[in-house]
Amino acid sequence: MLTFIGLGLYDQKDISVKGLEAIREADVVYAEFYTSRLMGATLEDMQELYGKPVKVLMREDVEQHPKDTVLSDAVDKKVVFLTGGDAMVATTHVDLRLRAKKMGIETRLIHGASIQSAVCGLTGLQNYRFGKSATIAFPYKDIISETPYDTILMNKKNGLHTLLFLDIDREKGYMTVNRGIELLLKVEERRKEGAVAGALCVGIARAGSPSPCVRAGRIEELQAFDFGGPLHIMVMPADLHFLEEEALQDLAGLKLG
C-alpha cells in the first residue's frame, strides 16, 4: 500500500488529521522536498509530531530509482510518501503513482493545502481566471528559458492570469520574486513583445505562515521590493475584474494611477 500525503504549505502542523493518522499507522515513511518544502519546520519537527522516522529522498531516488526504495517497500508494507503542498500537483508524483499501479500496488491520496488555492485566497484573484502555469528556472549554462514568457503572452491574449512557480535548486537555493522578475525582463529586452515590461505583477512569500507577504505593483517596482525569506511565488495578471482590482488594493498594496 502506498499513500501519498500532502503536508500543506508552511510547517508540520499543516497536515490533516487523516494524514497524521496514516503516518502513524505506516510501516515506512518517505518524503521528498525538492519540488516544495515546509519552510517553517525542520525534519526533526516533523518526526517529533508524527512519531515516526522520515526517510528523505533525493530527485534521482524518486524519478529514476523508485523501485529501490518506495515501490519495493510498498509491495508488502504500509508506506507513506510525504510532499509539500498537495501530493499530486507535481507531475513526478503522478508518475510515481502510475508506476505503483503497474506493479499492482494499491495507492491512496490524502490531499493537503495547495499553493494554487492559497494564492487566490491571499490576493483575491479569481481562481477560474488562471490559465496555464509555468516555472521560472535558474539559467542553465547562461541560457534563460523563454517558456514562462511565452506562457504569459498566451494567457494575456486569452484574458487569463499566469501563476509562476520559482525554481528550487540544491546548489543555487530558492529563487526569489526579484530574481524571477530579472529573468523575465531579460527575455523581454530580447523579445520586445510587451508581455511583461511595465506590466502588473504580484509577488507572494511564505504563504501559509503567520506572516505572509503579498505585494502588487508594476513589475519594475517589485524588482526592488524586499519580500523576505522563502518560499516565493509570482502572478502575472491579465486585465483585472473590478473585484480583483479592489482586492489587490486592499490586500496587496496596489496603487493605481
Curated annotation (Swiss-Prot):
Keywords: Methyltransferase, S-adenosyl-L-methionine, Transferase. GO terms for molecular function: diphthine synthase activity. Signal peptide: none annotated. Its EC number is 2.1.1.98. Pfam families: TP_methylase. GO terms for biological process: methylation; protein histidyl modification to diphthamide. SUPFAM superfamilies: Tetrapyrrole methylase. Pathway: Protein modification; peptidyl-diphthamide biosynthesis. It catalyses: 2-[(3S)-amino-3-carboxypropyl]-L-histidyl-[translation elongation factor 2] + 3 S-adenosyl-L-methionine = diphthine-[translation elongation factor 2] + 3 S-adenosyl-L-homocysteine + 3 H(+). It is an enzyme of class 2 (transferase). S-adenosyl-L-methionine binds at residues 9, 86, 89, 114-115, 166, 207, 232. NCBIfam families: dph5 (TIGR00522). Belongs to the diphthine synthase family. S-adenosyl-L-methionine-dependent methyltransferase that catalyzes the trimethylation of the amino group of the modified target histidine residue in translation elongation factor 2 (EF-2), to form an intermediate called diphthine. The three successive methylation reactions represent the second step of diphthamide biosynthesis. Homodimer. This is Diphthine synthase. It comes from Methanocella arvoryzae (strain DSM 22066 / NBRC 105507 / MRE50).
